[in-house]
């Protein structure tokens, strides 16, 4: 009888431990899912390697939309070009000058952003710059002056073609063999913590420059985000409950390097982080400010300016490209946005 009781206690303890192991929290996510950034990166690199040869760009000629998206939580702000670059010995990225926003983000196999390249710059890559591995993922963003103007899109497409990459070696990227089912299952668990990210300024960056908990969550919730010197992402709209009723958000313009074609935008997603509607994004380039200089985004307010369509359980992501400085954008977020911006019912016409 005593032996049976001990066995039952052991079984109960095992079941309890199993349940706890599957409960993802801010306290355990960095420990239990430490390799998730590497798995996510391998998932994207393996998919791309099947589509194009190494050291070759795959250009997306139109902005992302509900029928055309490769990475979770993409946006309409820029057109993406993706490549896997072999850095076994050395490689080079060359970006000609351009009079709109553009950037090549260099991501190593562990999802660390090891470099950023802007128009007019050339970068020489060597293997010692990587945290590990021999290949990098190039996440290139090229903006048009107006994402809905065909002439502007053509100009941006021509610039995409002018970006040059080269490498001494051409070894294909070899998948690490992670189970896609396990990667996606872990992603579903980890990204539930997205609204609770503790350090939104340190979600992305190079090794040693990120907050590990924020980094692990963001790797699943918004893979290939830029470091805060290049962009800041606010993954939660204050007051948003995922309701589909007409609502609005008014903000002060953030401190950005507008002379370098900096801009800010709002993009909305479904409950899983994917683009689900036609009118899902807008940037300040296509908005008229209110009389007091503020900007108002509207959600499911048909017929109103700056309106975005949303579905039940939606989330919104405010992107701010090229902050004046890390200190300036932190001050804006903490002392302006989080204190003054709040989702309200109705179109809030000013």
Segments (PLM) and residue ranges:
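A compositional/structural signature for long, glycine/proline-rich flexible linkers
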Residues: 21-350
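Gram-negative bacterial Sec-dependent N-terminal signal peptides
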Residues: 1-20
């Amino acid at each position: 009888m005593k032996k049976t009781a001990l066995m039952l206690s052991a079984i109960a303890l095992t079941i309890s431990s199993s349940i706890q192991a599957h409960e993802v929290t801010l306290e355990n996510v960095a420990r239990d899912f430490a390799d998730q950034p590497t798995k996510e990166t391998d998932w994207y690199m393996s998919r791309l390697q099947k589509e194009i040869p190494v050291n070759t760009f795959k250009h997306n000629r139109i902005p992302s939309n509900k029928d055309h998206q490769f990475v979770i939580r993409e946006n309409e702000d820029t057109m993406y070009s993706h490549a896997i670059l072999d850095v076994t010995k050395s490689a080079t990225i060359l970006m000609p000058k351009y009079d709109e926003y553009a950037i090549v983000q260099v991501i190593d196999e562990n999802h660390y952003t090891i470099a950023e390249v802007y128009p007019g710059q050339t970068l020489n890559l060597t293997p010692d710059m990587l945290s590990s591995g021999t290949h990098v993922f190039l996440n290139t963003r090229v903006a048009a002056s107006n994402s809905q103007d065909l002439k502007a899109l053509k100009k941006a497409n021509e610039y995409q073609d002018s970006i040059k990459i080269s490498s001494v070696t051409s070894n294909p990227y070899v998948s690490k063999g992670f189970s896609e089912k396990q990667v996606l299952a872990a992603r579903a668990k980890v990204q539930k913590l997205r609204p609770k990210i503790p350090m939104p300024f340190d979600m992305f960056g190079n090794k040693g420059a990120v907050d590990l908990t924020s980094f692990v969550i963001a790797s699943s919730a918004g893979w290939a985000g830029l470091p805060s010197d290049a962009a800041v992402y606010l993954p939660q709209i204050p007051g948003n409950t995922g309701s589909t009723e007409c609502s609005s958000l008014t903000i002060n313009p953030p401190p950005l390097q507008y002379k370098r074609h900096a801009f800010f935008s709002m993009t909305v997603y479904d409950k899983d982080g994917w683009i689900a509607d036609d009118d899902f994004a807008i940037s300040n380039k296509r908005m008229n400010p209110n009389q007091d200089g503020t900007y108002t985004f509207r959600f499911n307010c048909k017929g109103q300016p700056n309106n975005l369509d949303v579905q039940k359980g939606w989330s919104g992501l405010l992107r701010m490209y090229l902050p004046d400085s890390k200190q300036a954008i932190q001050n804006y977020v903490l002392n302006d946005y989080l204190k003054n911006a709040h989702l309200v019912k109705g179109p809030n016409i000013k």
